[in-house]
Amino acid sequence: MEARRARQKALKVKNLKNVRYMKLISVETSSSSDDSCDSFASDNFANTRLQFNREGCRTRSQCRPSGPLRVAMKFPARNTRRAANTKAAPPKPSESSANDSHSESDSEEEEDGMNFLEKRALNIKQNKAMLAKLMSELESFPGIFSGRHSLPGHRTKDSKSPRRRTFPGVASRRNPERRARPLTRSRSRILGSLGALPTEEEEDEEEEEDKYMLVRRRKSVDGYMNDDDVSRSRRPGSMTLPHIIRPVEDVTEEEIRNICSNSREKIYNRSLGSTCHQCRQKTTDTKTNCRNPDCWGIRGQFCGPCLRNRYGEEVKDALLDPNWHCPPCRGICNCSFCRQRDGRCATGVLVYLAKYHGFGNVHAYLKSLKQEFEMQA
């Protein structure tokens, strides 16, 4: 068995050696099919390949040369473009047709405007007729327009405008410019009747000396007013609250801490607050207490800013002083009510002007003006 295998192996080796030294023979065929091929060593291999490519291109219409793809496009001619544009563009209307359309539209607008005006005039006429009918019906009822009651804008031709009231000795004013103080209730008590009012010339003379206007008293019929000429009495009324004098021992530290140093610290409360005699504001801060037994009501209550700016005093010192009297009891109060009772005009916010002239409070500034006025008089 082994000998047989050795023989077969030797035979295979011999056959391989014979094939290695076999001579290559070129074979040429006359067919032009795709299965025919030439040996690579033959001289006619390149020629047969070129012939094959040429024959393939002749038989196949889809054969393309190697290289980039080239596409041929056909552009339309200029004449065709113009023709297409003329077809796409709408036909232009003629001038005559355009004028006709404009004239028709104008005539339609004019007709609409005329119709609107006619309707408006008709509506106005109907509304006026209805209003006149309603007015005639209302006037037929008795007692509707009695007295001064009348419809607004409804005035007869015979009615005249109300005349202005004129007083004897007083020049009428048609210009809204007003240099003199208006006649108030408190001023009428001081000046008396309306016939005693000063004329414009006298008022102009007073305005020339406006520097001492704050300390000068108002004129009466016979001259300047005296202290005995004040019409309003300084007695307490029936509705005046009783005056309570608080001793110094009742003043607590909490009340002293509750004293306001400026107006921004004030808290307004109309039910629990107390009223300041100077500014008339009802706030919750601590006020002064007058120790004068003849004082009445809340006349001796002053807040911190008013007492400092108007009289140069402090609320704390006033509360701790058992003999402190309020400015009205001392006769130096410069509030608007007390000055009007004395026949003088109100000062307004005078603290800034007083500080501008070098004074610390309004009372010192008014006192200096009064001294200058008395020296000149």
Swiss-Prot record:
Comp. bias regions, Acidic residues: 199-210
Annotated spans, Interaction with MYC: 148-173
Cross-link Glycyl lysine isopeptide (Lys-Gly) (interchain with G-Cter in SUMO2) placement: 211
The keyword Metal-binding is annotated on this UniProt entry: no
Compartmental location: Nucleus; Cytoplasm
A GO CC term assigned to this protein in UniProt: cytoplasm
Positions bearing Phosphoserine: 193, 220
Keywords: Apoptosis, Cytoplasm, Isopeptide bond, Nucleus, Phosphoprotein, Transcription, Transcription regulation, Ubl conjugation
Post-translational modification: Phosphorylation at Thr-166 promotes interaction with YWHAE and YWHAZ, dissociation from MYC and sequestration in the cytoplasm.
Superkingdom classification of source: Eukaryota
Extent of the signal sequence: none
GO biological process: apoptotic process; regulation of cell population proliferation; regulation of DNA-templated transcription
Pfam families: zf-4CXXC_R1
Region of interest (Disordered), residue spans: 58-113, 144-211
InterPro entries (UniProt xref): CDCA7/CDA7L, Znf-4CXXC_R1
Motif (Nuclear localization signal): 163-179
Annotated region (Mediates transcriptional activity), positions in chain: 253-377
Stretches with biased composition (Low complexity): 76-100
Phosphothreonine: modified positions: 166, 199
UniProt keyword Transport present: no
Quaternary structure, from the entry: Interacts with MYC (via C-terminus), YWHAE and YWHAZ.
Note: Cdca7 expression is correlated with MYC expression in fibroblasts and is much higher in attached cells tham in non-attached cells.
Function: Participates in MYC-mediated cell transformation and apoptosis; induces anchorage-independent growth and clonogenicity in lymphoblastoid cells. Insufficient to induce tumorigenicity when overexpressed but contributes to MYC-mediated tumorigenesis. May play a role as transcriptional regulator.
Record-given protein name: Cell division cycle-associated protein 7
